[in-house]
């Protein structure tokens, strides 16, 4: 009987101990290691493409659903008006460069020699005019010549003197060369004409529309023959690389997430396929949970936005698709 009592006491003590140690868990004070789950969507990354110049669309090379690579030419404008503009701008630039070169080179040696000869000729004419005036002045007192003839001789001397001074100034200008201000003005005109030609060439290059990155054509907005301006959209491109997931983490779980952390992602479309991802960005600003996020928590909770970069996403993850982000297991203190 005594042995039975001892056995009953041992069993009762064991049950009491089990109940005691299980009490915190039943009261919610202790939790088992768990795997946190976040909810989000594959980020929508699109770019609207258009020409930087106005013109008529001559060719559209891709259609909706076509895949393109960065640098692929997907549309062209009629380039003939732009080629003509380039030709005119280059000709104008060549004229201004020639004018500048002429000013910098100054007068040729033959031109200076000719100006010097002209000056010497004008000096000789001036000397003859002076002699004629002196003779007329001596003849006038005795009445050999009239006053009108004396005045004519004086006028001829003054005209010869003016021609000699003009020839001298022309020679000095040629010998000294062009003014620095004139050369600077010509240089500025040449630079402006060169810049205009460069701009015309850039406009010619802009008649081709190239894909800025790899992607899939989402929309073809215009058709061949349409007249477009720089504000008009021709294509909408969906960017396929890299694939980002936009997810949200509540403030109590924020300490479990850090940039560079590895996570796994699943989708409702292929729940058995697991994608590997890396947390690349955590927003420093809290926001309310977006209405598009499927979450069991209250939508009025403040959350922090995450950007997760998917490695080897394949073609199953499409933009806007809802996904589930699984964080690594973490033990929480009781």
UniProtKB/Swiss-Prot annotation:
Disulfide bonds: none annotated. Gene3D superfamilies: 2.40.30.170, 2.40.50.100, Helix hairpin bin (1.10.287.470). It comes from the Bacteria. Keywords: Coiled coil, Periplasm, Plasmid, Signal. Residues 101-208 form a coiled coil. This is UPF0194 membrane protein RB0873. Its main location: periplasm. Pfam families: HlyD_D23. NCBIfam families: PRK03598.1. The keyword Membrane does not apply. Belongs to the UPF0194 family. GO terms for cellular component: periplasmic space. It is found in: Periplasm. The keyword Signal applies. Residues 1-18 form the signal peptide.
């Amino acid at each position: 009987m005594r042995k039975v009592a001892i056995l009953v006491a041992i069993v009762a003590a064991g049950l009491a101990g089990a109940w005691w140690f299980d009490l915190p868990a039943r009261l919610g004070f202790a939790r088992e290691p768990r795997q946190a789950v976040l909810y989000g969507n594959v980020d929508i990354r699109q770019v609207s493409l258009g020409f930087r110049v106005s013109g008529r669309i001559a060719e559209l090379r891709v259609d909706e659903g076509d895949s393109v690579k960065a640098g692929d030419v997907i549309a062209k404008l009629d380039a003939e008006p732009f080629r003509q503009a380039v030709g005119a701008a280059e000709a104008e630039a060549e004229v201004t460069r020639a004018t500048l070169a002429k000013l910098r080179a100054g007068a040729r040696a033959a031109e200076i020699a000719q100006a010097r000869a002209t000056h010497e000729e004008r000096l000789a004419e001036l000397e003859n005019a002076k002699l004629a005036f002196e003779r007329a002045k001596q003849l006038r007192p005795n009445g050999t010549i009239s006053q009108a003839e004396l005045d004519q001789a004086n006028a001829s001397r003054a005209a010869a003197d003016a021609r000699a001074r003009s020839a001298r100034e022309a020679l000095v200008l040629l010998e000294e060369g062009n003014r620095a201000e004139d050369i600077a003005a010509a240089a500025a005109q040449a630079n402006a004409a060169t810049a205009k030609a460069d701009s015309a060439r850039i406009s010619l290059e802009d008649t081709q529309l190239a894909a800025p990155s790899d992607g899939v054509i989402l929309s073809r907005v215009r058709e061949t023959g349409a007249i477009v301006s720089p504000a008009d959209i021709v294509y909408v491109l969906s960017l396929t690389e890299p694939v980002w997931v936009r997810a949200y983490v509540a403030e109590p779980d924020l300490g479990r997430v850090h940039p560079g952390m590895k996570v796994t992602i699943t989708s409702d479309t292929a729940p058995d396929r697991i994608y590997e991802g890396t947390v690349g960005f955590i927003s420093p600003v809290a926001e309310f949970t977006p209405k598009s996020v499927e979450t069991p928590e209250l939508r009025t909770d403040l959350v922090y936005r995450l950007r997760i970069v998917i490695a080897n996403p394949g073609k199953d993850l499409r933009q806007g698709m809802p996904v589930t982000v699984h964080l690594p297991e973490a033990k929480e203190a009781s």
